[in-house]
């Protein structure tokens, strides 16, 4: 099967996200990359779910780890009857899909696809674990190819020799965006806020940009306004953990404040991804509150006195009036007209997963 991760950075290659083989799922530990290149080995699907919860893999990484975890679950129950295997896999699907509250709907969709593939493989007498693994690769190809289309539309918004600011780690879109810039001969420079407390901007986004040969600068999270004002930023762009059909954008905490500054500075903010039919309005969003102790440290080194309190909402919500456009694989849409996305193209369940 031809793969869509060709010419992308190390971090975006399928095997370096999550990979099932020989009764194990290996997940690149993004919590410590690039200082260390280590993989967490999961020998049960529960361990895969725990790795997702514990942020071993982040951004779109769970969308590879989850179906690979389903392949592992199929391997675990391979000696059972067909009915028993399906029952086991349904329980595994619940465990994996509920590993992180904010992405539960998309993860459920992914796991449902794996369940259908398991039913098909059982009926055909095939190896269920390998069938789900191959389905995962197929899903990745679909997602990466869609991201390439999104990258092309997004790059249209970049001026030659332009300056782009990101936030957190937009995963595949970063790689496909840069690959498109390179293919067009369009030179850009990038500013990446570090994105505490996990430093995804510094460790992941900046690493991908550097790996692919682009001028990239890491800034602290309190610098975006200064940089937008003094470094002639042309575009602010992020991906999203969810794009509600009413135009609200759910993404890594800090996106909202950067969007406010961008609006004030007259800098367009483009969010990338597909509208989420599972979130018709922002009212269905649950903001995940994580361990507040993470805000009291930096890469494991405590920065605050004992007894000081922390506060850690993982995401925030940017209202549509701050969004210049939603960049999809079908083009760029107004945040107030997202339902048109679903009438403009024939979107199947497999293709809804970003």
Label the predicted regions.
Residues 69-76, 113-116, 178-186, 208, ...:
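A glycine- and small-aliphatic-rich helix-loop capping segment at beta-alpha/alpha-beta transitions
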């Amino acid at each position: 099967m031809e793969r869509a991760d060709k010419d992308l950075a190390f971090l975006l290659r399928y095997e370096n996200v999550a990979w099932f083989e020989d009764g194990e799922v290996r997940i690149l530990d993004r919590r410590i990359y690039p200082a260390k290149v280590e993989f967490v080995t999961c020998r049960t699907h529960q361990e895969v779910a725990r790795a997702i919860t514990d942020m071993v893999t982040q951004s779109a990484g769970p969308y590879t780890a989850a179906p690979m975890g389903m392949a592992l679950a199929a391997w675990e129950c391979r000696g059972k009857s067909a009915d028993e295997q399906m029952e086991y896999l349904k329980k595994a699907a619940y465990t994996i899909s509920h590993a992180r509250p904010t992405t539960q709907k998309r993860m459920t969709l992914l796991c449902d696809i794996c369940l259908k593939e398991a039913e098909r493989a059982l009926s055909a007498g095939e190896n269920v674990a390998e069938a789900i693994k191959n389905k995962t690769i197929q899903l990745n190809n679909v997602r990466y190819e869609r991201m390439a289309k999104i990258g092309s539309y997004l790059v249209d918004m970049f001026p030659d020799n332009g300056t782009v600011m990101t936030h957190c780690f937009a995963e595949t879109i970063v790689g496909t965006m840069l690959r498109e810039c390179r293919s067009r001969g369009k030179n850009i420079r990038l500013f990446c806020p570090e994105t505490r407390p996990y430093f995804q901007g510094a460790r992941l986004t900046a690493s991908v940009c550097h790996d692919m040969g682009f001028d990239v600068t890491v800034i602290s999270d309190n610098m975006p306004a200064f940089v937008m004002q003094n470094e002639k930023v042309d575009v602010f762009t992020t991906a999203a953990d969810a794009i509600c059909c009413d135009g609200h954008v759910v993404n890594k905490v800090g996106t909202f404040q950067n969007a406010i500054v961008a609006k004030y500075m007259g800098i367009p903010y483009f969010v990338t991804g597909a509208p989420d039919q599972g979130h018709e309005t922002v009212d269905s969003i649950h903001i995940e509150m994580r361990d507040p102790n993470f805000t009291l440290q930096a890469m494991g080194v405590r920065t605050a006195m004992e007894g000081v309190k922390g506060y850690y909402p993982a995401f925030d919500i940017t209202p549509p009036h701050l969004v210049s456009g939603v960049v999809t694989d079908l083009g760029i849409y107004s945040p107030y007209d997202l339902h048109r996305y679903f009438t403009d193209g024939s979107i199947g369940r497999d293709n809804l997963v970003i």
